[in-house]
Amino acid sequence: MISSSVKFLLNDKLIVIKNPDPNQTLLNYIRTELKKTGTKEGCSEGGCGACTIVLGELVDNKIEYKAINSCISFVPTLNGKQLIIVEDLVSQNGKLHPVQDAMVKFHGSQCGFCTPGFVMSLLDLVFQIPHSIIMFLYLFHPGVILLIEVVK
């Protein structure tokens, strides 16, 4: 039986979507229903990464995070998960997340359209790094080399 609602966390707030459209993409939902336009639509087929978001899921009493392409994932995918979008990374006092700060500090964007997707992919990488490891990451993009020091 298909559930008549989708429940997920956004900014530590429980969101309930009643009678969700199973054909609505996460990208469309984020941009039209949540009115958050930081997540971009590029290719609409999961190839460019401009639409990257991060989902958290409780697995064996631990939250596992995974970057996904929101343009090819659908609203029911959110059920029981935590949604993290680029707008959620800035703290309430306006301080940038370390990944965002590094993008600014090292001039890690060009026109800026794909930058939210880069930031979310890097955030996913930060979640995947074991505790207490320092990693230097070189992100190559045409004309740009970004060096980020990630410390957990």
State the predicted function of each range:
Residues M1-K152:
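Signature of N-terminal electron-transfer/Fe-S-associated modules in redox systems
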